Regions:
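C-terminal accessory module of base-excision DNA glycosylases/AP lyases that mediates lesion recognition
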Residues: 1-43, 47, 57-62, 135-224
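A generic structural signal for ordered alpha-helices
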Residues: 42-43, 87-88, 120-121, 161
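Catalytic DNA-binding helix-loop module of base-excision-repair DNA glycosylases/AP lyases
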Residues: 107-147
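Short alpha-helix boundary/capping elements
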Residues: 68-73, 131-134, 209-213
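Short, charged/polar micro-motifs that form catalytic or ligand-binding hotspots
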Residues: 50-54, 112-113, 128-133, 169, ...
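Helix-hairpin-helix/helix-loop-helix acidic hairpins
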Residues: 53-118
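Amphipathic alpha-helical segments within well-ordered protein domains
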Residues: 46-50, 80-83, 110, 127, ...
Length: 224
C-alpha cells in the first residue's frame, strides 16, 4: 500500500536529517577519515570488503565496527578485539563468500564465525555495505518499534531468553529479507524523485526512532 503524502514527507525529512557519523579509519596511516556523506563511507567499505587481498577484507570488516560503534565509548576496544582475534582462514572464507553472496546471506556470513559478527545487527551491516541499494541494516534501534501499539514486521523476530542481541536463524533471516524488500518497495514506488536506495529508507526510519518519533515510524512500516 503506497504511503500517504504526509508519510512520504515525514520519511524524506527524516532521511535528510540522518546524522550518523560519516567516518572510517585509515589503518595504514592510523587516522580517522571523515567523508562528505554516507556515499563515501559505502564506497570505501564496499571496496575493502570486495578486495582481492585479505588485509583489505580485514580493514573493511574493522571499518564496519568502527563506523557502527562511532557513538559508543568502547568502539576502539571492539575494533582491536576483532583485529586480534580474526584468523587468516576466516578472512579467506569471508573474501570468497562476500564476492559471490546472493540473497540476504546473513546465515552464510554468520557461519564464517568472524569475531564481533555474530548477531543480526552487525552481520546485516556487512550485507548492506555490499549492496546498499537493495540491502539494509536491522539493528536494536529498529527493534524498539515492537514497543509501539502498531504491529510491524519486527514483531516477527524471534529471540532466545535473555538475548542481548538479535540472533541469526532462518526465521530471522526471512524477517530481514522482508524488511529489505519493504525498504526497496518504498524507495522504488514512493520515493522515486529522491533517487533513494533501500538503505536510505532504512536510515530514515532509524532517524525517526532516534528522534522520538517511533510511532510515526511504525505507521510507515506497517503501511508500506
Amino acid at each position: 500500500m503506497p504511503l500517504s503524502h504526509t508519510q512520504q514527507s515525514a520519511l524524506v525529512d527524516a532521511m535528510r536529517r540522518y546524522d550518523f557519523p560519516c567516518v572510517t579509519y585509515d589503518f595504514v596511516n592510523r587516522r580517522e577519515k571523515t567523508h562528505d556523506s554516507m556515499r563515501g563511507v559505502e564506497t570505501e567499505i564496499r571496496g575493502q570488503l570486495l578486495a582481492n587481498r585479505t588485509d583489505g577484507v580485514r580493514d573493511g570488516l574493522a571499518n564496519i565496527l568502527y563506523w557502527g560503534y562511532a557513538r559508543i565509548g568502547y568502539r576502539d576496544h571492539r575494533v582491536k578485539q576483532f583485529q586480534e582475534q580474526v584468523t587468516d582462514q576466516q578472512l579467506v572464507e569471508a573474501s570468497s563468500l562476500l564476492s559471490r553472496l546472493r540473497g540476504p546471506g546473513v546465515c552464510d556470513i554468520k557461519r564464517v564465525g568472524l569475531p564481533q559478527f555474530s548477531g543480526l545487527s552487525f552481520v546485516s551491516k556487512v550485507r548492506m555495505f555490499l549492496d546498499p541499494c537493495n540491502y539494509v541494516v536491522l539493528d536494536q534501534k529498529l527493534v524498539k518499534l515492537r514497543e509501539q501499539p502498531i504491529r510491524t514486521i519486527f514483531c516477527d523476530l524471534t529471540f532466545a531468553r535473555r538475548a542481548t542481541s538479535i540472533p541469526i536463524n532462518k526465521a530471522n533471516e526471512e524477517v530481514y529479507e522482508r524488511w529489505c524488500q519493504l525498504c526497496r518497495r518504498i524507495a522504488s514506488q514512493c520515493l522515486q524523485m529522491s533517487r533513494s536506495g533501500a538503505v536510505d529508507v532504512e536510515r530514515g526510519i532509524f532517524q525517526m526512532v532516534a528522534s522520538n518519533n517511533a510511532l510515526r515510524a511504525a505507521e510507515i512500516v506497517a503501511t508500506a
